Design a protein with these regions (language model features):
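Hydrophobic structural segments
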Residues: 3-176
Length: 176
C-alpha cells in the first residue's frame, strides 16, 4: 500500500495476512494463501468467514467486498476440477465473476502467536501457552546477541522466561 495513495491491492492484504500468519507455520497437508483472484486488483472492503460456502461467496459479492478471508481452505483435498457445474467450482466462479479474491489462513493462523488458538483459549478463560508443535521459521529462530558480561545471567533468564532457547522438549539451550 502506498502511503497517501489509499490504493490497497489484494497483494497488500495477502502480505499483511502472511506477516501475521506466516505460511511456513501451516501443516504440510494444508492449503493456505491466495486461492483465487488477481494480486493487482484493488481492495477497499474485505469480508471474513470461517468457511467459504456458496452462500458466503454470494454474500461477499452482494456486500461489494473485493476480498474474502476464510479460516478453512476451500480446496483442501480431492478437487480435480473447478468447473462451474461442480460444488467448489460454482463457489470459485461466483467469487471470480463478482470480483472477489479468496484467501485462507488455516493451520498457520492456528499456530501463529497471537493466533486463532490463543484467542479461543482467552475466550474460555485459559491463558494461552505455547504451540503444541512449535515450528521454527528460517531467519527468526536463531539470534546472535552481544551482552555485557555483568548482564549475561539477567538477560538470559529474561529470554528463557519468554520461551527462547527451546528446542523440542529441551529448554534453556544457548551457546556462549
Amino acid at each position: 500500500c502506498r502511503l497517501g495513495a489509499m490504493s490497497v491491492t489484494v497483494a497488500d492484504v495477502v502480505a499483511a495476512l502472511e506477516a501475521a500468519y506466516p505460511p511456513q507455520l501451516a501443516e504440510s497437508w494444508d492449503k493456505v494463501g491466495l486461492i483465487c483472484g488477481d494480486p493487482d486488483d484493488g481492495v477497499s472492503r474485505v469480508a471474513f468467514a470461517l468457511d467459504c460456502t456458496l452462500e458466503v461467496a454470494q454474500a461477499a459479492v452482494e456486500s461489494q467486498a473485493q476480498m474474502l478471508v476464510v479460516h478453512h481452505p476451500l480446496l483442501l483435498r480431492g478437487v480435480s476440477s473447478v468447473a462451474v457445474d461442480t460444488p467448489k467450482g460454482k463457489v470459485i466462479h461466483t467469487l471470480l465473476k463478482g470480483g472477489v479474491a479468496l484467501f485462507a489462513a488455516h493451520t498457520n493462523a492456528d499456530s501463529a502467536r497471537p493466533g486463532v488458538s490463543d484467542k479461543l483459549a482467552e475466550l474460555v478463560g485459559i491463558t494461552p501457552g505455547r504451540p503444541i508443535k512449535p515450528v521454527h521459521l528460517d531467519g527468526i529462530d536463531k539470534w546472535g546477541v552481544h551482552i555485557p558480561p555483568a548482564d549475561v545471567e539477567r538477560v538470559m533468564a529474561a529470554l528463557f522466561e519468554l520461551g527462547a532457547g527451546e528446542i523440542g522438549t529441551v529448554s534453556y539451550t544457548h551457546l556462549r
